[in-house]
Amino acid sequence: MGARGAPSRRRQAGRRPRYLPTGSFPFLLLLLLLCIQLGGGQKKKENLLAEKVEQLMEWSSRRSVFRMNGDKFRKFIKAPPRNYSMIVMFTALQPQRQCSVCRLANEEYQILANSWRYSSAFCNKLFFSKVDYDEGTDIFQQLNINSAPTFMHFPPKGRPKRADTFDLQRIGFGAEQLAKWIADRTDVHIRVFRPPNYSGTIALALLVSLVGGLLYLRRNNLEFIYNKTGWAMVSLCIVFAMTSGQMWNHIRGPPYAHKNPHNGQVSYIHGSSQVQFVAESHIILVLNAAITMGMDLLNEAATSKGDVGKRRIICLVGLGLVVFFFSFLLSIFRSKYHGYPYSFLIK
């Protein structure tokens, strides 16, 4: 037994320990350094992201919509890392630009941002900012933005897609429309809260006071209340005001017209079906009144018993008013509802 175990012990004693090849040490050292560098780089990215989010939260605590210049835009929006969405309004608010639509859009944008800032769902995943043309001309050129205002969504990862640019001409720039678009792009739902407006209540109180005072002064002679012509005129004025969009103007407060800052051309009719100017309401009111007058003349020519020649002239005048102004009204409708196939005389 002892003789058998002796050769085995001699063979075990004769074995030499195995060592790694000499050329593998640099490889292991390089792999170790690479792991350390990757870990350090990841930590650096996390620290940079935390600093960016902290800075954005600080700006948001001061203002719901913070301004950005070229350097801030490149650092907080274009450069990674990012884990937040950014809504940016590209605008031109300087007085020399004479962009009335920009001011109105800015008010709606501010209402939306305030609604998000003071909501219970507010978090560091969505921020609102704006870039003025006079403070970031290079950004406008880089993104090929030729008109203002323009709303864009910059996602946490990747580049903005076509749907990340808000279709202002088709949808309008109301806070509710912007909130719906943001919900589609970011899955963040914002409930819009508008500040109370007491101008309507004050105007109604003044109107009631005026009517009450008039009735009190004429309390001994109230025959004018039964005047059919007077009530008919009042009814027509109310109908013309409501059908021309005066109530929409009262709620939204649009500008009277829009002057293009590039060529100075003034637009009295907005190209979108969701937005209108005050001048547009006045134009529609006049057109409706002219069509009504034409219909009244046609009715007068058909029912009166006067001279036939005079009735024929009244009929032709009434028909001309209806045909021309209805054609004009239909052309305005076509210009706002793109793709509407029908027209009459005027295209």
Curated annotation (Swiss-Prot):
It is a multi-pass membrane protein. Pfam families: OST3_OST6. Residues 59-187 form the Thioredoxin domain. Keywords: Disulfide bond, Endoplasmic reticulum, Glycoprotein, Magnesium, Membrane, Signal, Transmembrane, Transmembrane helix, Transport. Residues 42-196, 243-276, 334-347 are lumenal. GO terms for cellular component: mitochondrion; oligosaccharyltransferase complex. The chain crosses the membrane at residues 197-217, 222-242, 277-297, 313-333. GO terms for molecular function: oligosaccharyltransferase complex binding. Glycans are attached at residue 83. Pathway: Protein modification; protein glycosylation. Residues 1-41 form the signal peptide. Residues 218-221, 298-312 are cytoplasmic. GO terms for biological process: cognition; magnesium ion transport; protein N-linked glycosylation via asparagine. The keyword Nucleus does not apply. Disulfide bonds join 99-102. It is found in: Endoplasmic reticulum membrane. Accessory component of the STT3B-containing form of the oligosaccharyltransferase (OST) complex. OST exists in two different complex forms which contain common core subunits RPN1, RPN2, OST48, OST4, DAD1 and TMEM258, either STT3A or STT3B as catalytic subunits, and form-specific accessory subunits. OST can form stable complexes with the Sec61 complex or with both the Sec61 and TRAP complexes. The association of TUSC3 or MAGT1 with the STT3B-containing complex seems to be mutually exclusvice. PANTHER family: DOLICHYL-DIPHOSPHOOLIGOSACCHARIDE--PROTEIN GLYCOSYLTRANSFERASE-RELATED, TUMOR SUPPRESSOR CANDIDATE 3. Belongs to the OST3/OST6 family. Acts as accessory component of the N-oligosaccharyl transferase (OST) complex which catalyzes the transfer of a high mannose oligosaccharide from a lipid-linked oligosaccharide donor to an asparagine residue within an Asn-X-Ser/Thr consensus motif in nascent polypeptide chains. Involved in N-glycosylation of STT3B-dependent substrates. Specifically required for the glycosylation of a subset of acceptor sites that are near cysteine residues; in this function seems to act redundantly with MAGT1. This is Dolichyl-diphosphooligosaccharide--protein glycosyltransferase subunit TUSC3.
